[in-house]
Amino acid sequence: MASPGLGLLLALGLPLLPARWGRAWGQTLDPHVNENGTITPSAPGSGSNGALSQEAITAIIVVFSLLAAVLLAVGLVLLLRKLREKRQTQGTYRPSSEEQFNHAAEARAPQDSKETVRGCLPI
């Protein structure tokens, strides 16, 4: 079951992934290449200090917000389905269960009265 939120999540999240994957594996956008063809890492102070960029923070917020919205929508649908089912069975007439309930109520003596139920012998 595909949801519209999943399509939106993929549309917004997938363009950000390739750029982030390259940086995660130590690749930079402009590597320094020596005369002999070896790539030298950039200076320790020139790169980021391990903090996430603004785009990464925004992408994380968007992804988790969409995930929360999808979970909320699924929960709401399940709740409405349960309420609709309960409303459909609330007013139904079931004679067999009604009779069982009435016979059980007649057989029990009221808790607060001192009367005995007719037809029962005292113990």
UniProtKB/Swiss-Prot annotation:
Subcellular location: Apical cell membrane; Cell junction, Tight junction
A GO CC annotation given for this chain: apical plasma membrane
Main location: membrane
Membrane-spanning parts: 60-80
Membrane topology: Single-pass type I membrane protein
GO molecular-function terms, A-Z: SH3 domain binding
UniProt motif (PDZ-binding) ranges: 119-123
Annotated Basic and acidic residues bias: 96-117
Quaternary context: Component of a complex composed of CRB3, PALS1 and PATJ. Interacts (via C-terminus) with PALS1 (via PDZ domain). Interacts with PARD6A. Interacts (via intracellular domain) with EPB41L5. Interacts with WDR83.
Official protein name in the record: Protein crumbs homolog 3
Lineage: Eukaryota, Metazoa, Chordata, Craniata, Vertebrata
Gene name, Swiss-Prot/TrEMBL: CRB3
